A protein has these predicted regions:
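Membrane-proximal helix-turn-helix segments that form the acceptor-binding/catalytic region
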Residues: 178-186
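Low-complexity, intrinsically disordered Ser/Thr/Pro- and acidic-rich segments
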Residues: 1-8
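Short, positively charged and aromatic/hydrophobic N-terminal segments
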Residues: 10, 16-21
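Canonical P-loop GTPase G-domain recognition
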Residues: 181, 196-253, 257
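Nucleotide-state-sensitive switch-loop elements of NTP-binding domains
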Residues: 29-39, 44, 48-178
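G-domain G4 guanine-recognition motif of GTPases
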Residues: 123, 154-159, 187-202, 220-229, ...
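Short, structured coil segments at secondary-structure junctions
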Residues: 84, 186, 214-215
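P-loop NTP-binding site
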Residues: 27-44, 48, 239-270
Length: 270
């Protein structure tokens, strides 16, 4: 390519370099690990769902790395997942949104030990604003290592129907409900777990309400205990991209007050 002809020559060289660069990026990106984050409020069944999901991915011949997270240490979730044979790293003492570097370090450690094809990360049940604090920086800073899946948020249907005003019953204080609703707001996929615990009519009512309140989001129903609906969920998060990189508005003072109302008990019982 001749560079003497001012603009056109330089443009041709730049185009060629860009093509070579894109070829290298495509080749490198083909080796990226899929990064799946599964959030949701306390008691929604995240760990059981993740265990089921990991088993199905493992059955596809994929290597799985799991990352657990909670406010305490020596997590029961970690012990349970390790007992099922999965390579599992633990981030105690704070949620992913405040421990981003620890999250990256955990993924690096799993990569060195077992070279996962897929990472599944489970944030603290009271955590929200994960798009701004985790998935966006992962994509922007470590996009050559990770292919980011849509953010799934798992919900308990009975609790969700009470909070959304579909059914009467006890629910959390307004400050805790604020966190719950923010989790739904930022989800790419809302996964109704424990579908076997409610009637088909109630399930359809809940799906309709979620579709109405959160248009554009994928709403799915599963039973982690019975194994129902997991294939559809897995296909979606394997093939789809996150809906948005836009951070939502969060009142962090209200968020902190809501978290302060929640408590954790870590104990080993013999």
């Amino acid at each position: 390519i001749q560079l003497r002809d001012s603009g056109l020559g330089y443009f041709a060289l730049a185009f060629k370099c860009e093509c070579l660069h894109n070829d290298r990026v495509t080749q490198k990106n083909s080796n990226r690990a899929r990064y799946i984050m599964v959030g949701g409020f306390l008691g929604a069944g995240k760990t059981t769902s993740i265990s089921r999901l990991a088993r199905k991915l493992s059955d596809q011949g994929l290597r799985i790395g799991l990352i657990t997270n909670d406010q305490g240490s020596g997590l029961v979730d970690t012990a349970m997942l390790r007992s099922k044979g999965f390579a599992t790293a633990e981030i105690p003492g704070g949620c992913f949104c405040c421990r981003f570097n620890s999250l990256v370090d955990a993924a690096d450690g799993l990569t060195q030990d077992s070279q996962p094809d897929v990472f599944i990360a489970e944030p603290v049940g009271s955590c929200t604003d994960l798009v701004a604090t985790v998935t966006y920086p992962l994509r922007r800073i470590y996009g050559d290592q990770f292919e980011i899946a849509p953010l799934s948020v798992i919900i308990d249907p009975v609790r969700a129907m009470r909070i959304l005003g579909i059914k009467p019953g006890r629910k959390f204080s307004d400050k805790v409900v604020y966190i719950y609703l923010k989790q739904l707001e930022e989800a790419d996929v809302v996964v109704i777990n424990k579908m076997e615990t409610i009637s088909e009519a109630d399930l359809n009512h809940l799906i309709d309400r979620l579709d109405s309140e959160y248009p554009g989001k994928k709403v799915m129903a599963i039973s982690a205990r019975e194994g129902t609906g997991l294939e559809s969920w897995l296909r979606h998060i394997q093939a789809s991209e996150p809906l948005s990189e836009t951070a939502m508005d969060v009142d962090y003072e209200l968020y902190a007050e809501g978290e302060a109302l929640l408590g954790w008990l870590n104990a080993t019982v013999e």
